[in-house]
Design a protein with these regions (language model features):
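C-terminal nucleotide
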Residues: 1-16, 25-151, 158-185
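Conserved active-site tyrosine of GNAT-family acetyltransferases
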Residues: 22
């Protein structure tokens, strides 16, 4: 959790900070993000919480939500040491077919509560990111999938593990890594 006084994550890092900052200041997070030209996903996810599938479009439409329990003990974020600036990357050439494929795999994984399928979706998304010129992420022992968070090109990266033992071992072995857990109110 973050507040205006307690922000214990790096800024400009891909964790939805600009959307969160707008919400904490009483602004409409979706409008604030759209004004930056970066999309509505972060403030919509923050406002809704949980493990969500959203319909693509100009404004957020929630398709499906669950608690995310299948992710408990299986995720960590890794600080790459490089800030990123999503608005400066919005004009990059994108592989929309591969992005759509990753999204469809993720949607099916959430509906089926299938961790392995979700890891495949994350790996497909990472393939898109590499195609957009992002640097390869650090290999972490025990990780089954990883990708940059947010707009990528730096910031935090998500790493997924088969179980909490593997995740906790990776966190202990990698100083810039911290465990994260799903949150649903």
């Amino acid at each position: 959790m973050v507040s205006l006084r307690d922000w214990n994550y790096e800024q400009r890092s891909g964790l939805g900070g600009s959307g969160a900052w707008a919400l904490l200041n009483g602004e409409d997070g979706v409008e604030a993000e759209l004004d930056l030209g970066v999309g509505w996903q972060d403030p919509a996810v923050i406002r809704e919480s949980g493990f969500c599938v959203w319909r693509s479009g100009h404004l957020p439409v929630l398709d499906f939500k669950q608690s995310g329990e299948m992710l408990a003990g299986r995720m960590a974020i890794y600080w790459t040491g490089i800030e990123h600036d999503t608005p400066s990357n919005t004009d990059l050439k994108r592989d929309y077919d591969l992005i759509e494929k990753a999204g469809k795999i993720a949607q099916q994984a959430v509906h089926a509560r299938d961790f392995d399928m979700l890891a495949k979706a994350v790996a497909t998304s990472y393939e898109v990111q590499l195609g957009e010129g992002m640097q390869e992420l650090v290999a972490v022992e025990g990780a089954v999938a990883n990708k940059y968070c947010g707009g990528g090109h730096g910031g935090y990266a998500l790493y997924m593990f088969n179980d909490q033992t593997a995740r906790d071992a990776a966190v202990a072995a990698n100083e810039p890594m911290r465990p994260i857990e799903p949150y649903c109110r």
